[in-house]
Amino acid sequence: GQNFTSDKDLYTDSR
């Protein structure tokens, strides 16, 4: 899924 920490800086996904 999409797990955004703050903005679109650090996101844990399979991108």
From Swiss-Prot:
UniProtKB keywords: Calcium, Heme, Hydrogen peroxide, Iron, Metal-binding, Oxidoreductase, Peroxidase
Under catalytic activity, the entry for this protein gives: 2 a phenolic donor + H2O2 = 2 a phenolic radical donor + 2 H2O
Q: Name one GO biological process term.
A: hydrogen peroxide catabolic process
Into which EC class is this enzyme placed?
oxidoreductase
Tell me its cofactors. Answer: Ca(2+); heme b
What remark does the entry make about the cofactor? Binds 2 calcium ions per subunit. Binds 1 heme b (iron(II)-protoporphyrin IX) group per subunit.
Q: What is its EC number?
A: 1.11.1.7
Source organism's superkingdom?
A: Eukaryota
Q: Which GO terms describe its molecular function?
A: lactoperoxidase activity; metal ion binding
Record-stated family: Belongs to the peroxidase family. Classical plant (class III) peroxidase subfamily.
The free-text function statement in the UniProt record for this protein reads:
Removal of H(2)O(2), oxidation of toxic reductants, biosynthesis and degradation of lignin, suberization, auxin catabolism, response to environmental stresses such as wounding, pathogen attack and oxidative stress. These functions might be dependent on each isozyme/isoform in each plant tissue.
Q: What is this protein called?
A: Peroxidase 9
Q: What is the lineage of its organism?
A: Eukaryota, Viridiplantae, Streptophyta, Embryophyta, Tracheophyta
